């Protein structure tokens, strides 16, 4: 078929949400000519649900995006109204930052970045069709019948694919926040032969701030201590006049209202068909599933400095509007609250992620990538993490360079993508610290140490950023060496100091590092014995040093496991393997292998339903094939 291409790009990104902006920025910064197409420019990097960035596991993803050279961390550092470090009373593996965002400012700042980015064109247009020839992407077609050529296309449409909003018995075609739904593109993806799923998510009502009685709620302030998502942000720019959130609860009256109206709840009446998120259920779902709970937490979260809208986190619902009003008014502090927006559920199409490679390129069509909620995930942070990887790999493919695959030991982004492409998902996927087996080495405080070098190699970390990173890394390395080299001896003078600090005296000579392994001994305590470092150390470097030393034994075990898995990941499986040619593997394993087509032995071993015996048989088969090929080549 001949095409009348009016414009030509290296990469076209469809959708300008959190995945789309990261994908387009990464690819354009790598030198590709990129078109970022969106149904509505006003909704670029918009937050249709919660007005926040970060949280458990998610905050670490934001730092990983930043370390690779992405934008989300920098953008939230320019637009937050509250910053808080979570889980400070727990171990370092689960600590993470969370920021309350000024949602309008967040979108505005990101738009400014996108509009000023070299090689990147932003355009409001609806893409109806992805053009494919001989199994390869060649471009797209718009609703206005314009055809644009492209070497790669990245689909980041979020919840817009055949989106439908549901409130009570009302159901209508819509994308997020009542924007247009992408119906022709959804049809096109089906026609291209992709297996499509149907998921659901939801959002709570918004209430007017001046109508809330805050006196009967519990204040939730931000942190006074400076913290940032981006490693480029400075402590002196930390916002001091932060806006608090407030805590309240549902009660017996709230639960009775919901119980009495379950017959009108789309979740239970059969109107909602899509699968909802397990870890962010609607309030009506919570009341049914956790009937023994007397109350549920609700956080009142301001949506910005210049708006009266307050997001009622924990009250996601698609109940009819009249029921929502009664429900809101049953809650302490909201007795007279004005509802500014009604909560709703949204159903949407998504691509079942087992059809993707770990680069986020589809297996079916060369040059077609997908990222974000299109792949079955939930959350802005998960979307951004996939977006930057899709953008990087689309650019690398076009440039004929080696693809980037983040391993599970590299970061939470690697964990998420591996989970999606290896295990698939039957519900909106959310990142949790429990999903990461190497979480002690995937911490919020070492994301830059893990990924900045990758970002530099790809071309997303500039000279200034790299110079700052090298200074930090050198300071860290030098101080660790110093702590390993200086010995504390059990002499009278030293032990007098040790006991004065309230610690048990030394019985043997130990290095400063060994002394610091004691749970009660801090870096600052050790400095009293060995003096300060040659250069003054930033507080965050000290935190990193303490964590690495105090958890060294656990970290060492984790790194040993990583090495074992690395060897399995290096054993590649040929793309043209005939799974029916392998004798003795279990039927379930054969079926899963055919469906997922794992690329490495490591990936094959993580597929549910595949046991160690199947992996052993597969390895014997591959070794036999390899020997056979070697013999034939030797003849």
Curated annotation (Swiss-Prot):
Swiss-Prot/TrEMBL keywords: Cytoplasm, FAD, Flavoprotein, NAD, tRNA processing
GO molecular function: flavin adenine dinucleotide binding
Protein residues bound to FAD: 15-20
Location within or outside the cell: Cytoplasm
UniProt similarity note: Belongs to the MnmG family.
PANTHER family: GLUCOSE INHIBITED DIVISION PROTEIN A, PROTEIN MTO1 HOMOLOG, MITOCHONDRIAL
Record note on quaternary structure: Homodimer. Heterotetramer of two MnmE and two MnmG subunits.
Protein name: tRNA uridine 5-carboxymethylaminomethyl modification enzyme MnmG
């Amino acid at each position: 078929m001949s095409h009348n291409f009016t414009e030509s790009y290296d990469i076209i990104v469809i959708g300008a949400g959190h995945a789309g902006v990261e994908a387009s920025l990464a690819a354009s910064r790598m030198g590709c000519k990129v078109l970022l197409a969106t149904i509505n420019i006003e909704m670029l990097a918009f937050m249709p649900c919660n007005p926040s960035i970060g949280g458990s596991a998610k905050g670490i993803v934001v730092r990983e995006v930043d370390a690779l050279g992405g934008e989300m961390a920098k953008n939230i550092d320019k637009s937050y109204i509250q910053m808080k470090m979570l889980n400070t009373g727990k171990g370092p593996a689960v600590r993470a930052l969370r920021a309350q965002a000024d949602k309008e400012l967040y979108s505005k700042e990101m738009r400014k970045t996108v509009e000023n980015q070299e090689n990147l064109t932003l355009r409001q247009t609806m893409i109806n069709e992805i053009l494919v020839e001989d199994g390869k992407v060649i471009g797209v077609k718009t609703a206005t019948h314009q055809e644009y050529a492209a070497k790669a296309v990245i689909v980041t449409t979020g919840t817009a694919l055949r989106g439908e909003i549901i409130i009570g018995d009302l159901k209508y075609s819509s994308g997020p926040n009542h924007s247009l739904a992408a119906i022709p593109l959804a049809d096109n993806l089906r026609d291209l032969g992709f297996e499509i799923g149907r998921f659901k998510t939801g959002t709570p009502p918004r209430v007017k701030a001046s109508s809330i009685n805050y006196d009967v709620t519990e204040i939730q302030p931000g942190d006074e201590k400076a913290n940032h998502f981006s490693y480029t942000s400075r402590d002196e720019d930390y916002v001091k006049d932060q806006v608090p959130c407030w805590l309240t609860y549902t009660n017996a009256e709230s639960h009775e209202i919901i119980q009495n109206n379950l017959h009108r709840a789309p979740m239970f009446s059969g109107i909602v068909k899509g699968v909802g998120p397990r870890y962010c259920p609607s309030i009506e779902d919570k009341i049914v599933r956790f009937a023994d709970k007397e109350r549920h937490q609700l956080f009142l979260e301001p949506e910005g400095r210049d708006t009266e809208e307050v997001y009622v986190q924990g009250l996601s619902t698609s109940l009819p509007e009249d029921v929502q009003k009664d429900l809101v008014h049953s809650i302490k502090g909201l007795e007279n609250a004005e509802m500014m927006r009604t909560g709703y559920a949204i159903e949407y199409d998504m691509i079942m992620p087992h059809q993707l490679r770990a680069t986020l390129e589809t297996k079916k069509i060369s040059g077609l990538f997908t990222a974000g909620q299109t792949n079955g995930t939930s959350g802005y942070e998960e979307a951004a993490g996939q977006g930057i990887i899709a953008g990087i790999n689309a650019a690398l493919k076009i440039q004929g360079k080696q693809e980037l695959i983040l391993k599970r030991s590299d970061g939470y982004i690697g964990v998420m993508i591996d989970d999606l492409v290896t295990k698939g998902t039957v519900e909106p996927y959310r990142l949790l610290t429990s999903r990461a087996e190497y979480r002690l080495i995937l911490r919020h405080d070492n994301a830059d140490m893990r990924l900045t070098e990758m970002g530099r190699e790809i071309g997303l970390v500039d000279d200034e950023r790299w110079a700052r990173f090298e200074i930090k890394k050198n300071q860290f390395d030098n101080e660790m060496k110093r702590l390993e080299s200086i010995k504390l001896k059990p002499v009278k003078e030293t032990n007098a100091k040790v006991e004065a600090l309230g610690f048990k005296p030394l019985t043997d000579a130990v290095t400063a590092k060994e002394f610091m392994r004691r749970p009660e001994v801090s870096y600052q305590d050790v400095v009293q014995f060995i003096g300060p470092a040659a250069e003054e150390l930033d507080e965050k470097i000290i935190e990193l040093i303490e964590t690495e030393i105090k958890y060294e034994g656990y970290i060492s075990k984790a790194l040993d496991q990583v090495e074992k898995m690395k060897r399995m990941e290096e054993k590649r499986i040929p793309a043209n393997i005939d799974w029916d040619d392998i004798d003795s593997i279990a039927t379930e394993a054969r079926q899963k292998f055919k469906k997922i087509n794992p690329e490495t032995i490591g990936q094959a071993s993580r597929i549910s339903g595949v046991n160690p015996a199947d992996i052993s048989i597969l390895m014997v088969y591959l070794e036999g094939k390899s020997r056979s090929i070697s013999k034939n080549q030797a003849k």
